[in-house]
Amino acid sequence: MSALAMLLSSTTAAAHATPAACEKRLLPPSPGAAAGQNLAAKDLVQLRDFGESSVSPDGRWAALILRRADPARDDYCIGLVLVPLQGSGAARFLDIGGEPIQLRMDLRGVSDIVNGSIADDAPVWSPDGRTIAYLRRDRGVTQVWIATPQGRPRQLTRLADDARSVEWSTSTTLRIQYRPTSKALAQISREGRGGYLYDRRFWALSEARPNPPPSPFEIVTVEISGGRTVPNLAAAPDPKRSPAARLYVTIPEGGRAWTAPQQPLRYAGPSVLTVEYRGRRIACGDICGSRVSAIWAQGDTVLFLRSGNPANGGETEIYRWDLAREPSPRRILATQDALYSCALAGSKLVCGRETALHPRTLAAIDSGTGATNTLYDPNADLAGRIRNSVERLRWTDPNGISSYGDLVLPAGYRPGQRLPLVIVQYQSQGFLRGGVGDEYPIHLFAARGYAVLSITRPRPPSSDSDAPDADSYQRINITGWADRRRVQASLEAGINALVARGVADPDRIGLTGLSDGSSTVQFALINSSRIRAAAMSTCCESSASGVSVGLAYSDSLTRWGYPAPGSDNPQFWKPYSLAANAEQMQTPLLIQVSDREYRLALETYAALDAANAPVEMYVFPDEHHVKFHPEHRLAVYERNLAWFDFWLKDQPTADPGSAATMARWQALRLRSTR
């Protein structure tokens, strides 16, 4: 992966909608309620989304957090939903309110860098099934709330610092994880009175003040009856569980199953599944080697899920193994659909499920046959509104490296008709919304007459190495730009396949990307002549990248093989830096970046502009690596559609409000032919 992808990237919104208004927005509409209406950018932004779900101990219910964006208010509606898993009852809300919780990560010695993506944590059921605990954020602080299956939500904690996770220790007590940062942040504010010492605490890309170094998370145990804090009682570890086990289950009829690294000294080596049953270890061959990402056990039976990858065309598989009766596992399901957060409920697996043409639903998968049926669809009104066709394509580059993509074509496409092609990156799985970061609306492009290729990047060269640590792993990818060359070769192979089929017009190809996808755009614009227009959501690696982000990040780049700050190495940058190749750049480039990351783009934009290259850049306020604000996401969608219409279809938008934009783009057209 590129250094740009190693970056990660409090939101201020208008007054929230009332719970009653939000309930109306969140309620699933009747199937076909919008039948016959064309899909619009606003419809995609306003889809009802949920992350992980959890199943009650008795297997009768699932709980999940549902959210829906509102671009008109630049806000979100959020609700705790209870879904019946048996019978025909309707899903119902137990709580409505709160704000989205954004993901945070520690990176390069800097704590709690906000990514912009919304956390997908599931509500958690008490062991007796009487209470559900969940995280809810209000007025910028995340606390623990509880509700019963009958409703009656209430706030349990009033922590000074955000609650980060919650789990049950008994049916009446909760273990809550938090990070005490308020004192450290106050100390940094006091430091500012005399000026901040610039050091490795700075993530200068995002803000002009230091962050506290990562501090340990702490645990508090709370009684749910009155919120009283009680002594922490950590669960006793299972003495049979190896410390190296990544996944682990106990087999009720006597045994255990777990995954662990096959070669523990490798930084990113594969994990393999091991099964012990009634005192003996049972081999299951290649099926249990790598890609096992979930395990369940019931009676004498083990179920496990193998995730898709670039080499197998992204196919997800579920296997069932009756240890008392079957010599080896048997596959009960193979699918191109994406499955999320599966949990065993009786004889069924309950999973979040996405298809290429429909967003996430809650589905039940029969653990004996693999038969699947939908339990809950929060976007039933989308049925019939996406009329594009989707085909999974697989290809191999000249070096034998495999990957895949999804070809999306407009309804009524005639074989042999060459269409302008837009390529979206860099993981093609589940509902084809907008690529990684969700900025390039795949189905809207197809509905406007484009062929769209949603691609999955190949595994990096370092994935087959014995690299012992992250720095060694990255150094393999950076040396000779090995990873970028591999991704470019795969990209070219996918394009060649569509040109050979008569689908893609080779003179009208557009390329898009965020994060690692932006790195692919950057490399392709220098090393290929096939791209006629491009759009980036993050930009760009250049000789100034390290110092733009901060000292700790710059240290990492140097360890990976980048030139040290202050050193002049044009030979290193020539194959990759747009700034170093600005004089040759003629491909129109649209850059839409966040205010927390735009500094990384300044050298590249300035060099391209000075060279009279066709470039335009927008900076979105209060955003991070992934854009979060609904009104910004809508603006990004619409501008990307207009950009490629202008350059690949020669169709300026007729919107009177866009006259100034069209005049600028016409001026850029003169630059592109200089």
Annotate the PLM regions.
Residues S53-A62, D121-T131, R139, S165-L174, ...:
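Blade-terminus and WD-like Trp-Asp/Gly-His loop motifs, strongest in beta-propeller folds
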Residues R108-A119, R136-F217:
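Asp-box/WD-like beta-propeller blade repeats and closely related beta-sheet repeat scaffolds
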Residues A21, L26, C77-V81, L85-Q86, ...:
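Predominantly five- to eight-bladed beta-propeller fold
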Residues R73-L80, G140-W145, A184-S189, S215-V220, ...:
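Structural motif
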Residues N38-L80:
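Beta-strand-rich domains and repeat architectures in extracellular enzymes and scaffolds
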Residues I455-R674:
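Active-site-proximal cap/loop segments of hydrolase catalytic domains
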Residues H16-D49, V83-A119, R136, I146-R164, ...:
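Multi-bladed beta-propeller domains
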Residues Y376-R501, L514:
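Cap/lid segment of the alpha/beta-hydrolase catalytic domain
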